[in-house]
Amino acid sequence: MLKFVILLCSIAYVFGAVVPLGMLSQSDGRIVGGVESKIEDFPWQISLQRDGRHYCGGSIYSKNVIITAAHCLRNVVAEELRVRVGSSYWEHGGSLRNISKFQIHESYVEPTKEYDVALLKLDSDLSFNSTIKAIELTNEIPPEYADAIVSGWGETLVPPPGIPDQLRSVDVKIIHREKCASRNFGYGSNIKASMICAYAIGKDSCQGDSGGPLVVNNLLVGVVSWGIDCARPSYPGVYVDVSHVRSLIVSNAESI
């Protein structure tokens, strides 16, 4: 599948076309152009795991609810999933928790990644401390070009191959939906109302970071969703706009 995706990217580049949406959802993600980080600086960060392997990120919303991306939950059941909290390392440390159920946003559209957000319900409550904390949701869209930070685990595009054990983070700038859909960038009408973008030359979230946090001033402003390639010029990372889906997150978290 990976070779097929790379081939599609090459064809798209040569002919100036956009790879079909969903082909490069950032679900097996990596942080590109980032640095090793400690969980104390991102205590809301979790590793979503299946079959003992990290494959998506997420954010702690409350003592028993995690926010992640809807596309991370395709073709899975809750019993297959685990969440590691409180560790800078996806493979060890902290605490590994079971998922009792999950809920995908009712307006999620798989082909376009609209409303690409979901909630996970833990089977027991977390105890908050310096490495395990909830993150507050933003009430509004952050200013254009605001400093933001993305964190997660995954391939770094530099040797050795494979995903790094330690959490990584990268600084990016907020790009509003209207500008992300403009001629300044390559997405056009693929950017929908539920999305926001972030961009920096040579820096990006990528496959495996999906569901993870985009943060401004310690507020969750975005959920890693999709993009064309990773850190590719003119193609910012695309995120769920948390201000756009906040009310439904809050109400569903109370009822899940």
UniProtKB/Swiss-Prot annotation:
PROSITE patterns for the chain: TRYPSIN_DOM, TRYPSIN_HIS, TRYPSIN_SER
GO molecular function annotations of the record: serine-type endopeptidase activity
Subcellular locations according to the entry: Secreted
Highest taxon in the source lineage: Eukaryota
GO CC, any one term: extracellular region
Positions annotated as active site in the UniProt record: 71 (charge relay system), 116 (charge relay system), 210 (charge relay system)
Disulfide bond annotation, renumbered to this chain: 56-72, 180-197, 206-230
Secretion signal, residue range per the UniProt entry: 1-22
Site (Required for specificity): 204
UniProt propeptide residues: 23-30
Domain Peptidase S1 intervals: 31-254
Keywords of the record: Disulfide bond, Hydrolase, Protease, Secreted, Serine protease, Signal, Zymogen
E.C. numbers: 3.4.21.-
One GO BP: proteolysis
First-tier enzyme category under EC: hydrolase
Function according to Swiss-Prot or TrEMBL: Specificity, limited to carboxyl side of arginine residue in B-chain of insulin.
Protein family according to the UniProt entry: Belongs to the peptidase S1 family.
Name listed for the protein in its UniProt record: Hypodermin-A
Native organism: Hypoderma lineatum (Early cattle grub)
